[in-house]
Amino acid sequence: MVKIAVIGAGVVGLSTALQVKQNFPFCSVTVVAEKFNTETTSDGAGGLFRPNFLTLSANPLESIKQWSQDTFSHFNNLFNSPEASDCGIALMSGFLLSNKEKLDMIEDISLGQSKMTAEQIAKMGFDCKHVTKVLTYTMECRRYMPWLTSKFLSLGGSMHHHRLKSLEELVGVYDVVVNCSGLGAKDLVPDPLVYPVKGQLIQVEAPWVKHFYFFEDDTYVIPNINRTSLGGIRIKNDYSTEVDPEISKSIWQRCTSRIPSLQKAKVLWEWAGLRPHRDPIRIEQDVMNFPKGTLKVVHNYGHGANGVSLSWGTAKHATRLVRQFLENDPELRSKL
């Protein structure tokens, strides 16, 4: 039997593990990770499907479009299925607001968008020049990640709690490894192009907020099913995972000044974490040589703040690369 390991249990790792198991049901597929569920960076995702093309500029546009479209199609299928209530997806309309930069999404990866006129912007009380109304999805990761895990395990996948110090540990144990280690890839590969971007948000109870708001200065308000996320920040090469009270104060001030109805919202909890960024995102095959032997690796990491928006699409891409490894190696092909 072919043995495949997926390193990492964030939204990218779990999406990849599920697709690999779905495509290769007779292979043994194991998720190997140090952190699971609420311990992962994905737990702090705002969850809005909105690929940020400004932070993805190092990637080929056609790749970004394909990853985005594949993820959007997956979310669309989930929303129109009985799984919707369990997986955390919601259909959401909202506003992209800016003075300088265009924050529009590509039209064919949203359910619709339209520019607001200056008169409409004034009536809404928005203090900006450009506003685009968008219909898209939000995904609540505290529901989605357990759902992905459950689906993966139901197909016969397995989980292994382990902190890897080197990929060499997997030589001779697994036939193919999919590396979705996020920021861990900086030391595990090692890859000097990976760096942390600190994010911080406040989760509040505000059931009266029914639309998302995304501003060009990384300020956002994103309602999910049971809570609303207020953010945010983007600090490169900051390794602190502690909630900074001054940053929280800034987030609260920015969000409540623009959406005054949030001023009496109940704070549920605060979160800070490190988003794993790389220019470009790394999705490719790699045959790594170690003293113990060689290891077939498919890399899939470096998504930064685009983990949720690109997760299913990059997982699909990585799964194709796994298939190439299996089909092009006579020994592995004979085990299928």
From Swiss-Prot:
Its cofactor is FAD. It is found in: Peroxisome matrix. Belongs to the DAMOX/DASOX family. It is an enzyme of class 1 (oxidoreductase). It catalyses: D-aspartate + O2 + H2O = oxaloacetate + H2O2 + NH4(+); D-glutamate + O2 + H2O = H2O2 + 2-oxoglutarate + NH4(+). Pfam families: DAO (PF01266). SUPFAM superfamilies: FAD-linked reductases, C-terminal domain, Nucleotide-binding domain. FAD binds at residues 34-35, 41-42, 304, 308-309. One of its GO terms (cellular component) is peroxisomal matrix. The keyword Flavoprotein applies. InterPro entries: D-amino_acid_oxidase_CS, DAO, FAD-dep_OxRdtase. This is D-aspartate oxidase. Its main location: other. It comes from Octopus vulgaris. Its EC number is 1.4.3.1. Keywords: FAD, Flavoprotein, Oxidoreductase, Peroxisome. A motif (Microbody targeting signal) lies at residues 334-336. GO terms for biological process: D-amino acid catabolic process. Monomer. GO terms for molecular function: D-aspartate oxidase activity; FAD binding. Selectively catalyzes the oxidative deamination of acidic amino acids. Suppresses the level of D-aspartate in the brain, an amino acid that can act as an agonist for glutamate receptors. Protects the organism from the toxicity of D-amino acids. May also function in the intestine. Disulfide bonds: none annotated. The enzyme is inactive in complex with 6-hydroxy-flavin adenine dinucleotide (6-OH-FAD); the complex is not physiologically relevant but an artifact of purification procedures.
